[in-house]
């Protein structure tokens, strides 16, 4: 079992503190949902874990299996088994989907251990079929001209191909219709097992109808203020964040 620990994490952007002491433990074999209103620091948390240089960690630790990874670059964290599926994936012309994924899969392997072209194609075909993706997607430039739904499927395809220890899934349900949501959820559920853990960031309970979390954490004002099991997401759907905030004595303004 691998463990990702976030201890008293404070993160700022351009001098403004966004995370104000986050404590969280993620384990392989578990799926945790991070829920909360917009602007409470959910995406900042995933970016900080992955090492985005635009986010300054001013206090705290991020430990992967007991080792502090704060001084590691993004690519080094990825090679240790961290994966981030972004809400708005970048378009990268000049490199195809297939080229990108094979390079990523082989990045941390010795020459004798690199995946062969045959094995790569076999695995790629299998995972693309699972997600209902056309074969031509493999030869298109990375995310270039992709629709929002295609980009989200492509992020999950990368997840299935790379098989990381921990996936940070940042609002992968954003902008998806119900059919695309089911496909994306199917891909995430395919990964579930003792060697895989996920942190799913979402604003709504809808995604969790298809990916049942083991744990649910509620973020408000840069902190995790409440934790529970999947029933907590259902409670949020009924009461809203205002109801939770009132119960906890937290000041909360409804979004306009």
Swiss-Prot record:
InterPro entries: AAA+_ATPase, ABC_transporter-like_ATP-bd, ABC_transporter-like_CS, FeS-cluster_ATPase_SufC, P-loop_NTPase. ATP binds at residues 36-43. Coiled coil: none annotated. Keywords: ATP-binding, Cell membrane, Membrane, Nucleotide-binding, Transport. Residues 4-246 form the ABC transporter domain. One of its GO terms (molecular function) is ATP binding. SUPFAM superfamilies: P-loop containing nucleoside triphosphate hydrolases. One of its GO terms (cellular component) is plasma membrane. Its main location: membrane. It is a peripheral membrane protein. It is found in: Cell membrane. Belongs to the ABC transporter superfamily. Ycf16 family. This is Probable ABC transporter ATP-binding protein spyM18_0273. It comes from Streptococcus pyogenes serotype M18 (strain MGAS8232). The lineage of its organism: Bacteria, Bacillati, Bacillota, Bacilli, Lactobacillales.
């Amino acid at each position: 079992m691998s463990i990702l620990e976030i201890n008293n994490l404070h993160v700022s952007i351009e001098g403004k503190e966004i995370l104000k002491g986050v404590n969280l433990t993620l384990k392989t074999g578990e799926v945790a949902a991070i829920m909360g209103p917009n602007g409470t620091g959910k995406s900042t948390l995933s970016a900080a874990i992955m090492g985005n240089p635009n986010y300054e960690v001013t206090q705290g630790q991020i430990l992967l299996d007991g080792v502090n990874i704060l001084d590691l670059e993004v690519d080094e964290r990825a090679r240790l088994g961290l994966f981030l599926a972004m809400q708005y994936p970048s378009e990268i012309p000049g490199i195809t989907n297939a080229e990108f994924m094979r390079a990523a899969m082989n990045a941390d392997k010795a020459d004798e251990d690199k995946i062969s072209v045959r094995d790569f194609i076999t695995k790629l075909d299998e995972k693309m079929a699972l997600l209902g993706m056309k074969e031509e997607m493999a030869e298109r430039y990375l995310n270039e001209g992709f629709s929002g739904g295609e980009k989200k499927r492509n992020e999950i395809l990368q997840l299935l191909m790379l098989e990381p220890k921990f996936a940070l899934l940042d609002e992968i349900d954003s902008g998806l219709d119900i059919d695309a949501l089911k496909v994306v959820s199917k891909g995430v559920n395919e990964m579930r097992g003792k060697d895989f853990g996920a942190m799913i960031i979402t604003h709504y309970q809808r995604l969790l109808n298809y990916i049942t979390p083991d744990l649910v954490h509620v973020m408000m004002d840069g902190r995790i203020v409440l934790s529970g099991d999947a029933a907590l997401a259902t409670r949020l759907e009924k009461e809203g964040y205002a109801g939770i905030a009132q119960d906890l004595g937290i000041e909360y303004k409804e979004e306009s």
